[in-house]
Amino acid sequence: MVPQVSADPAGIIDYPRRLERNHLYFAFGGGVGRFGTNFTLFHLNGTTIWVDVGSGFANHHTPGMEKNLPNRQLLLGFPPTAIFLTHGHEDHIGAFPHLVHVIAAGTPVYTSPFTAALLTNRLRDRGVDPARWD
């Protein structure tokens, strides 16, 4: 059985303190059953790994929105210890430039040289210094 974790009634998100040690937890913050917003996290004993930080695409269900981002509660509740980006498609890296306030400077980002170049360009386009994650 997978334990379910929900936010405190006060809206405070502190998921990691509720999780048992020596148990691997994972969650999907998007990309399941639909195209876009690929985001998966793995958490074990205080270490959180994000795999992909993609954006979704606006459609007739989201009028007025330019992009969809991964689940906010997961992003804020589990800041990354490291990030792995599988490839450079927008649905796998597109949310990263919009989440720089959640991703601490110096957080290791592992990816291919080509994907790193794409991400660097997207960060610069938004006025963010990519050297924060070298």
What role is predicted for each listed range?
Residues 32-37, 44-85, 94-107, 111-117, ...:
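Pre-active-site segment of Zn-dependent metallo-hydrolases
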